[in-house]
Regions:
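Gly/Pro/Ser/Thr-rich low-complexity, intrinsically disordered segments predominantly at protein N-termini
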Residues: 1-193
Length: 193
């Protein structure tokens, strides 16, 4: 092992093996090797929307081979522009159809569909940072749920680029491009909030 004499030679980025050793009281994600502290406990609105969506999604996939998971659930993403095993996220909801991606630690690879429910403190991270991560890692579909304005954005991966559908608002039905039989009324997503 050689001596490090210059700050530029230090590797301050972390990997999944480091992540597994942490015992923080707060939840964190690892984004391209850098630690990102997550928001404290989600709001009641966030949790209600999460339960509503999870119920609808889980009911649809109950008789399918795909698996549905809710946070906290580690997803290790393959990011081409970062070191291997340097990105671990905890999406609000994710659907994984390839059993080979699942292990005892969570998901190792891009889920088929990820849902993020916006919170005031996480909206920039979910709309910007995670959008780019999910697109780069090959998540086929990404839903962003806006709880204050009550709409859902659906992005589908086409030629490695997310293409957005028009926002789905109350009175409309969310339709997945990758699971066309799954149709969820937006009013059901925001029930009881």
């Amino acid at each position: 092992m050689h001596s490090i004499t210059n700050f530029a030679d230090l590797d301050l980025t972390k990997q999944y093996s480091d992540y597994l050793l942490w015992q923080f009281s707060e939840r964190v994600e690892l984004i391209k090797g850098f630690i990102l502290k997550m928001s404290p406990a989600p709001s009641r609105k966030h949790q209600t929307v999460s339960q509503n969506l999870n119920y609808k999604i889980y009911s649809f996939f109950n008789n399918h081979s795909c698996n549905v998971f809710v946070a906290p659930f580690d997803v290790r993403l393959p990011i081409k522009s970062a070191k291997k095993d340097s990105t671990v996220v905890q999406p609000d909801i994710c659907i994984i159809c390839d059993e080979n991606k699942l292990d005892d630690q969570g998901c190792n690879g891009a889920p088929d569909l990820i849902v993020e429910i916006l919170s005031p403190k996480s909206s920039k991270h979910d709309v910007d940072t995670k959008f780019k991560l999910y697109q780069e890692s090959g998540v086929k579909e990404y839903w962003i749920v806006e709880t204050e304005e009550r709409f859902v954005l659906v992005y589908s991966l086409e030629n490695n680029i997310y293409i957005g559908q028009k926002p789905f608002s109350v009175g409309e039905i969310i339709q997945s491009k990758i699971f066309p039989e799954m149709k969820i009324p937006v009013v059901d997503v925001f029930h009881k909030i």
